[in-house]
Amino acid sequence: MTTLIVSSNRIAQYWALTKPRVTQLAVFCAVIGMFLATPDLPDWKIVIAATIGIWLLAGAAFAINCLVEREIDSRMARTARRPMAQGEITVPQTLVFSGVIGGAGMWVLYNFVNPLTMWLTFATFVGYAVIYTIILKPATPQNIVIGGLSGAMPPALGWAAVANDLPMQAWILVLIIFIWTPPHFWALALYRRDEYAKSGLPMLPITHGTAFTQFHIWLYTIALVATTMLPFAVGMSGLIYLVVAAVLDVIFMWYAWQVYRHYTDMIARKMFTYSIIYLSLLFAALLVDHYLRF
């Protein structure tokens, strides 16, 4: 019984390294991209293989992130319980784990999907685990903006998996997530600013102040609203998406305005939480509209 408990705890620790909640949202957006890439239903074998491969490589990237930021995580209440921050998993163990699941993901994508998706997903891995985590995040308060492309790539990965191509429509999906990322993370950085100050990371509220950050959340929100209209503007989606996007955008703008003009930590926290719901519902609306367009 003791052995089973220890094994279960170890599995849970490795699972936590992959940041499962973040991975789930990324993979969800990738799956939506798979369905939007074809007017019919995509091949279920491709969907399953691509989902597994993208999930594995995303998990590998997040494991490297946990490794690199283990000391920073230990100084922040939000992240102090992560396995690397707690010293529950060693550096060699994390490297091996990331290498194994990342390699497995590449193998699945190459053999059961297509080389384009494998290389794009690998490039996304490098973009997040190396360029963003190691280079940009500790160096500039614009880390979220510059490094946001890697986090925005999942729908393009899904599209490439099914179509073996990346047309304009796929990049519109990437652009939506790219513009969504700064207000999403800056809302978190605002109400967690004391923790980020202890971490040593140059997050925007620390380097430029809260008022500057609040204003830029509002600016990016305006840009996001305009960007979410692109699928309808180019004929990629219809009225169902337009109506849902408009409602979601109005709520997002309300939160952003409150953060900008009537700031409290509570409203920033609510905006951060809503931004996750927002992105999920926005992509779900794209999927529903794709098959029920009128």
UniProtKB/Swiss-Prot annotation:
One of its GO terms (molecular function) is protoheme IX farnesyltransferase activity. InterPro entries: Protohaem_IX_farnesylTrfase (IPR006369), UbiA_prenyltransferase (IPR000537), UbiA_prenylTrfase_CS (IPR030470), UbiA_sf (IPR044878). One of its GO terms (cellular component) is plasma membrane. One of its GO terms (biological process) is heme O biosynthetic process. The chain crosses the membrane at residues 22-42, 46-66, 89-109, 116-136, 143-163, 170-190, 211-231, 232-252, 272-292. Pfam families: UbiA. It is an enzyme of class 2 (transferase). Signal peptide: none annotated. Coiled coil: none annotated. It is found in: Cell inner membrane. Keywords: Cell inner membrane, Cell membrane, Heme biosynthesis, Membrane, Transferase, Transmembrane, Transmembrane helix. Converts heme B (protoheme IX) to heme O by substitution of the vinyl group on carbon 2 of heme B porphyrin ring with a hydroxyethyl farnesyl side group. This is Protoheme IX farnesyltransferase.
